[in-house]
Amino acid sequence: MPTSNELYDLAVELRDQGDKPGAVSKLEEAINLDTSFAIGHGMLAKLYADLAESDKAILHAKKVVELEPNDAFSYTALSVIYQRCGRIPEAEYAKAMAYQKQMGLE
């Protein structure tokens, strides 16, 4: 049985070949093996946004923030996902949180 990292690598290959649904499938397998696999949730957020599945994109972006609450980039990525999904107030809030994390203003 492949590991989460191996499934992630397969997902990257599929994404690079233009098979985003196939990549999503491999990433879903990866996070089912390890629900704390933040990089898998991050790529799922991006792919679901690309596939116009906003609710799933936001869910996975929020999971990254939950898993890595002190990482400014996690909030930046969440902001971008919110923006791409048309949720501007939430995007602005996540951007502000990223700034606070980056500047140590918690």
Residues covered by each model-derived region:
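Alpha-helical segment of the N-proximal tetratricopeptide repeat
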Residues: P2-L33
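Structural signature of tandem alpha-helical TPR/SEL1-like repeats
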Residues: D16-E28, L51-K63, C85-M97
